[in-house]
């Protein structure tokens, strides 16, 4: 029989709790574990095995943790004997003042068949406790035409059955006393007093329509005409008035994947007020190609002045136009080029987009200088191009221009097509492999604050990045894969994350923005993947040359995620199958074993979800797909976010069924997670089949993997459109297997081809539920759809949850991914697990 082990708290800091325990006679070692919820069903997670009688729990003390220490004695019947056990709850100690936006109440009034539906924001700072259906705290007095009509205590929505579309509404935060009297609250925040009156949405339906100023189309150098479509979006309070503004990316109809040849029109970014007024327009210029991989725009208040900025990769020719309130042009200016580049002869009038002839000439120049390439000089690559191509040496080196041209002809007409019929290098045009690259921070009003060199230059056209090494020769592909994000690396302030590369070399830069300047926090670089022949090799399954970060290469996805994976109060960067700690160190890079027994990286994938998937497991989890097929240990897997290890599946009796990851011989495409089955605990995960968070296959048809949305009043998860994402028109249908179709919008479209993304899924106003922003079919307006079903749940806006808020910032990054709260959000959630302290 085990005895009681007493834990004694010795000290507590912002990020650590120190404790010890008395000696247990006969103890061989002690097992320390913890969990992040008091619920009995939550499993303890082992932290350490030690012979010492003290321990430091390295967790942020802005929440409670439940620590258990077990003493084990000598083995009996080949099992360790548990002889003592003790538990302790760590106290709240740290109350960080996290930098956040000061939003208004976000009240909306929407006409329905039964009256006027109202919904508004509730903030984390206003929450005081828990109820059976949500949170408690501040309540709300509702006004119609400046006359009180209700006091709402159990939610943040209300249906005024007597209201009309001619009425105006406002809400006031109040505190209902024991006597039932509602008294106004006081405070210095924008939402602490009664909000301004709002009118009912003019559409007469459950969407707000914002007319936009569509840019004029154009013609490429190849004579192809293009128009502009509304694409990805972001939100931020750029002028500090408490309302979100809407940043819209305009993609030309000829925007391209980084692997596809051809000219593109210019990418354009607009900023709009909610009434449709255009504040500014950023024309990325000719030297930023249009497509999902090139322009990731991070909108956030980076400097803490109460107004959101925008950070984006720029180039010579990028031009900002600011507008007056009447729509006239206030100013127009190019970005600031570096003095070094200007002295070298570069200018804002330059155009570095290559024609097919430009590319041919570029290759002739490369071949002429072959012997000067650092990899050739170092002996890493063959001395001659003939050896690279597997033919007998024919020419003296260094090559003359004529000889180089002959070899380029051979390369383009014989060698490349011989490796793949898709290698049509004579038609290679529309790419950019030369010229300066910049990173610019713009103020909310469009003013350029600072422009610096992009942290990791391209260096070449992709030769060093492996773009010529595989059978499919794709110059300017791996080298031009960009990601971006926002992370609270110090737990208090937001930092900008800018990245380049993930198939081979992978690079990540982190900046703060202080007093008008970028301030580097850290740089991460895997180094190039060594190749013996840049024209015939496989760089995907190797590590980069850097001793510290080499294993990061090839692990990134077409997006990233930001989360505090180890509960230390600082956010980490989840870079696909790898993770960078808040201080820039490599936290892990996940490997496992192929069926052959060979150890291999989990590798690149198209879809990743970081969330509280299993409510009974401490910390966060990651669900990925991996596209390495036979070369990857898993086609998909559920991993522990803190360690990157693949979780195991267990039966109800505790039998270990092996890893919750399955080998696949083909690329499975995408995956998704969400609460789609009310009868199964935890979030469900799916690719082709649906599984519980414990790894049990469920008898359900897999829903769409396009994009998820928390739309329903019952806290469940919905998806956009159907599971057949390769066929049909995606217009943003919200549905699930429980409720069926919940929203079937008309005259709208989703973006990005088969990916079927909305412009943005985010809780931009109203209560805790997410809103759906779609483009109108004619690309002249956006529509913001909201759910007008009444809910009796009271939760703070997810925009007040830092993990979710930065997720909204990075949602536009490359292959748009769903973002999640730091806590478990589902129809079976325990409201007591929602954090009330930042």
Residue ranges and their predicted role:
Residues 1-26, 78-130, 186-202:
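Pro/Thr/Ser/Gly-rich low-complexity, intrinsically disordered linker/stalk tracts
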Residues 1-4, 24, 34, 38, ...:
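Mature, Sec-exported extracytoplasmic domains of Gram-positive
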Residues 3-5, 9-20, 29, 34, ...:
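Intrinsically disordered, low-complexity terminal and linker regions enriched in polar/acidic
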Residues 22-25, 59-61, 111-112, 122-124, ...:
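Non-cytosolic beta-sheet module surface loops
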Residues 29-62, 74, 119-166, 177:
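Recognizes extended acidic, P/S/T-rich segments that occur
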Residues 66-72, 170-174:
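Extracellular recognition modules
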Residues 100-102, 127, 141, 151-155, ...:
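Beta-propeller-forming repeat regions
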